[in-house]
Amino acid sequence: MSKTRIVFPEFTNPYIQEAIRIAKEKFSDFEAVGADNLEHACAAVKAGVADSMIAGIDYTSREVILTARDIIGVKNPRNLEKPTFSASFIFTKENQASPIGQSVFILGDAAACKHPNSEQLYDITLQTHETAAKYFKYLNHESTDSALNNFLTPRIAMLSFSTLGSGGRDETISLTQAVVEKVRETHPEILIDGEMQLDAAINPRIGEKKAPNSPVAGHANVLIVPDLNSGNILYKAMEQFGNFTAAGPILQGFNAPVSDLSRGSTVLDIVSVIEAELALIS
């Protein structure tokens, strides 16, 4: 089995070293590569010496994102003047009632795009769906169990203060609704709905009451926020109030997988990001 090579520009950091040690014991397909600095790490990915990069325990998010943008590059499938890149978080928490023993949510964008317009929000939605689909496939392990397959099917809720028009007229509501319609037109296979309040998105009882005909209400596992302000607040709330473990930010839209660690990351946080990177590359 060929191993996935992840480069770490902060290779000598003790947190990184301990996370690598644990990850090597857990994941047989993982190989760590060191680099002197952020530029050299990105160059290693660009040259194919490494499959992906994890950085940020010492570097700022701005440094990681801009260096990756300039060296690794951003995909531009729609030939935009400024192609979109974004970031998602993978949230997990033990839940014995679920088919995989844990609750899982993917949140985008909570780290990169401050005030997305409709085109950017459309790209963020598709990029986050791609991340979710790859991660859920990794968790699925090609199972034929119907309950497991249903649980690990991406279902996108476009979050808002309003549910399907209940908030009246508002620019952000109109923007979100336009994105939902565009995704449905261009990717009819994707399960998506919105705009939608968080409780309607993830609580089956409330979802049935507020959006009875929705394909995702009450069972959403991919949450798209309208801007970075609300996204970062939700990300911190899920960690601090909800006791979820967050892996990320997982940068999206780049020519190779890149993850930006929080400078407050624990060793186990870093291990979670390593696992997420392995899932996205597998």
Give the residues covered by each predicted segment.
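Anion-binding alpha/beta catalytic cores of soluble intermediary-metabolism enzymes, centered on
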Residues: 1-217, 221-282
